């Protein structure tokens, strides 16, 4: 292996970086190939399983890490089931590690949603590629479109179109079509293509395009938000509608999702947008136009429209009807409402993610974390932990961390009000982090990189940590106190 490295390094074979690079190659070549997926899993369905299986089949990926929206999703709605349950289902169906997308980014536009997800993958420093679905199914075409979008999306180009009341996505598409032709512009007609373009843009902007290889799978069975479906694959939107209507959806999801939905229905814990009617109206009626103007995606006088609508609306449907305008998609308006509810400000989106919250993992997920922990830190490095208490402590020294913790806990506490049966607050400190043990699993990592993961509530994990540390300290003390074999022999001779 060292000879291979010397050949690769050429004249730089005696560079101070050589020990690290040699170590890195020895630990990774032929052992791990990690691909990331940025997702929502709302709920986890057969289309997601197809993506995971095809990613492994076509790329040779051995490990899958998911950056998953927490309790709220990018369409501006609460997730059907809480983040801990969705993460648990994911690791039982092919995902190895689930990390939470911070709420301020899960409720952001496509560009910022993608940027945060890519940043978190980059922060692990051991991710080899990113897998995403798209309607076009071609990384080459998506990359061409990403370059075009990056070039034409300037304030000077956008301003004339926006002043005509043209929505931002349509304005971007018009600019791309005008300069690069309709074939490139038409790529932006489809929602998954748009996200795919943003993933590639983010990789390029963050300087990760050479480290994290984009890989796309052509969507099968159903388009995003479509009611069309194959015999086994349907969109999340269609599945949620079936659940809401009380119809059979089992053909489109794994058993774990069927069981979880049944459990949540029985306990009346499914979360729906309509259940937030009163709390949203209450919050909006307590905000001034100036406060609303500080909310992400609010501009061009929209704060005044929201302010007036909240005072006369008698239902959530009425509120949305009074706010909506042609230039703003409904998903954007819904995101604004939840951002306002949680006090998320535009300035919050100028701060990169400050930590990575682990929601679920298995043995391979533990390998990903161990590998990440063995690599040198860089500009994207952030801490990862399953316990939010770790970040509360860090927040005492860093106001950005404390702010992020506050947004997370507040949004989770409000989420518990969104089901028919109201749950206690404190989900982020009581929710169970899943560790799914793989039967017969044997780690191929070197012995010094193996790790034993812990599962349970944050309190249980903290207790296990303390017990491990105590046992380790006791073992070390016993070792120091015990006489060596050589000394014992000398004493016996006396």
What are these regions (language model features)?
Residues 13-31:
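Short, Lys/Arg-enriched N-terminal segments with co-localized hydrophobic residues
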């Amino acid at each position: 292996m060292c000879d291979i490295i010397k050949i690769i390094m050429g004249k730089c074979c005696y560079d101070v970086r050589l020990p690290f690079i040699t170590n890195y190659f020895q630990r990774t070549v032929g052992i791990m190939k990690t691909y990331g997926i940025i997702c929502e899993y709302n709920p986890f369905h057969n289309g997601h399983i197809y993506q995971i299986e095809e990613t492994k089949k076509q790329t040779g990926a051995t490990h899958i890490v998911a950056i998953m929206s927490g309790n709220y999703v990018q369409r501006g709605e609460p997730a059907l089931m809480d983040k801990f349950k969705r993460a648990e289902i994911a690791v039982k169906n092919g995902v190895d590690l689930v990390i939470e997308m911070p709420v301020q980014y899960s409720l952001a536009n496509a560009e910022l949603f993608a940027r945060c997800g890519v940043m978190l993958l980059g922060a692990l420093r051991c991710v080899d590629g990113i897998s995403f679905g798209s309607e076009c199914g071609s990384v080459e075409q998506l990359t061409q479109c990403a370059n075009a979008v990056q070039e034409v999306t300037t304030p000077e180009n956008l301003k004339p179109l926006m002043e005509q009341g043209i929505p931002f996505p349509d304005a971007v598409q018009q600019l791309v079509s005008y300069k690069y032709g309709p074939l490139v512009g038409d790529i932006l007609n489809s929602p998954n293509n748009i996200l795919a373009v943003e993933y590639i843009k983010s990789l390029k902007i963050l300087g990760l395009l050479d480290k994290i290889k984009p890989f796309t799978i052509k969507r099968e069975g159903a388009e995003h938000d479509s009611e069309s479906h194959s015999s086994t694959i349907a969109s999340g939107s269609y599945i949620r509608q079936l659940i809401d209507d009380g119809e059979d959806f089992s053909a489109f999801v794994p058993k774990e999702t069927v069981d979880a939905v049944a459990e949540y229905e029985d306990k009346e814990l499914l979360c729906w947008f309509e259940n937030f009617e009163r709390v949203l109206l209450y919050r909006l009626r307590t905000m001034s136009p100036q406060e609303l103007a500080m909310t992400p995606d609010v501009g061009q006088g929209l704060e005044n429209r929201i302010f007036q609508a909240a005072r006369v609306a008698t239902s959530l449907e009425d509120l949305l009807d009074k706010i909506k305008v042609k230039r703003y998609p409904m998903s954007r308006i819904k995101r604004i409402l939840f951002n306002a509810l949680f006090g998320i400000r535009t300035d919050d989106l100028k701060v990169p993610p400050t930590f990575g919250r682990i929601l679920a993992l298995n043995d391979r997920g533990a390998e990903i974390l161990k590998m990440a922990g063995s690599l040198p830190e860089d500009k994207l490095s952030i801490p990862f932990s399953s316990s939010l208490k770790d970040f509360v402590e860090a927040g005492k020294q860093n106001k950005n961390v404390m702010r992020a913790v506050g947004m997370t806990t507040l949004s989770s506490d409000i989420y518990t009000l969104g089901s028919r049966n109201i749950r206690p607050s404190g989900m982020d400190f009581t929710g169970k982090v899943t560790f799914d043990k793989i039967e017969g699993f044997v780690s191929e990592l070197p012995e010094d990189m193996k790790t034993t993961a812990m599962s349970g509530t944050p309190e249980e994990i903290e207790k296990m940590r303390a017990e491990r540390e105590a046992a380790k300290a006791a073992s070390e003390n016993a070792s120091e106190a015990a006489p060596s074999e050589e000394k014992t022999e000398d004493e016996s001779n006396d």
